[in-house]
Amino acid sequence: MSYDLETAERAAYAPFFGYMGAASAQIFTVLGAAYGTAKSAVGICSMGVMRPELIMKSVIPVIMAGIIGIYGLVVAMVLKGKVTSASAGYDLNKGFAHLAAGLTCGLCGLGAGYAIGIVGDAGVRGTAQQPRLFVGMILILIFSEVLGLYGMIVALILGTS
């Protein structure tokens, strides 16, 4: 029986960190998406009392918040596909890289969801009183959405390298 030093030093708990990365990507982006959806929906509901004709036009922040959750789903599925057992060669370096990828995507999505919720709420209420604010609201929402997209791009680079 021979002793293989590389196999002996491979941590059996390395896949745990990979799966934690996949889970954190999904959990944190969905938390951000839920907050953005709820906060924007509160603004839409209070605006709909005064100007019900603007409700469909004001759904954009809710849609953009939902897209943040999809970013986390994509990264979680990519990371889940990369995690193997420790005996198949999955080491701590890969586990920590996948954890970093998941946290990057998740926390960027959480921040983007918060930003979309706050901007969506204030923007929808403001648009009800001054329709010219709509374009500015959309631009700020796009910049907020891009924060989550940046996190997904970095996570995919970290997760596949």
Swiss-Prot record:
This is V-type proton ATPase 16 kDa proteolipid subunit c 3. Residues 37-58, 120-137 are cytoplasmic. SUPFAM superfamilies: F1F0 ATP synthase subunit C. The record marks E145 as: Essential for proton translocation. Its main location: membrane. GO terms for molecular function: proton-transporting ATPase activity, rotational mechanism. Belongs to the V-ATPase proteolipid subunit family. Expressed ubiquitously. Higher levels of vha-2 are found in adult H-shaped excretory cell and rectum. Higher levels of vha-3 are found in gastrointestinal and hypodermal cells, as well as H-shaped excretory cell. NCBIfam families: V_ATP_synt_C. Vha-11 and vha-3 are transcribed on a dicistronic transcript where vha-3 is the upstream transcript and vha-11 the downstream. The gene is vha-2.
